[in-house]
């Protein structure tokens, strides 16, 4: 069974060399792109929205972040009203384990480095997870 993304991020944060073990992990790539690429910042208000945390143990919640990464684009769709995006986001948070919900909020706010200080833009650019930031002319 695949590791939960929070477990992988904890592992990488403990030993940054472990990031090379996950170069083919698309869910991790999505997380890093949305957490660090300004063009992919989710069109949602910053901060933690009001939501009811799921009390189920990790792996027993209705959703898991690995499966939900494919749907991140929804939070940037221009055809959805802001209130609908917020409703969808809150619904996701309520379906995730509290650790994954906390991670999802950090991704949305592009503050992953606050949860995992050793996972930096420089590390991700150096390992090819995200594109290098280019300076505008």
Briefly describe each language-model feature range.
Residues 1-137:
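N-terminal nucleic-acid-engaging modules of covalent nucleotidyltransferase systems
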């Amino acid at each position: 069974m695949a590791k939960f993304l929070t477990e992988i991020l904890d592992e990488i944060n403990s030993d940054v060399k472990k990031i090379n073990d996950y170069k083919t992990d698309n869910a991790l790539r999505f997380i890093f792109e949305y957490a660090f690429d300004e063009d992919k910042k989710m069109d949602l208000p910053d901060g933690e929205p009001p939501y009811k945390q799921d009390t189920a143990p990790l792996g027993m919640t209705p959703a898991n972040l690995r499966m939900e990464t494919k749907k991140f684009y929804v939070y940037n769709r221009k055809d959805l009203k802001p209130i609908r995006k917020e409703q969808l986001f809150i619904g996701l948070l309520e379906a995730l384990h509290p650790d994954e919900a906390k991670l999802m909020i950090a991704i949305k706010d592009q503050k992953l480095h606050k949860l995992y200080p050793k996972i930096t833009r420089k590390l991700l650019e150096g390992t090819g997870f995200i594109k290098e930031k280019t300076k505008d002319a």
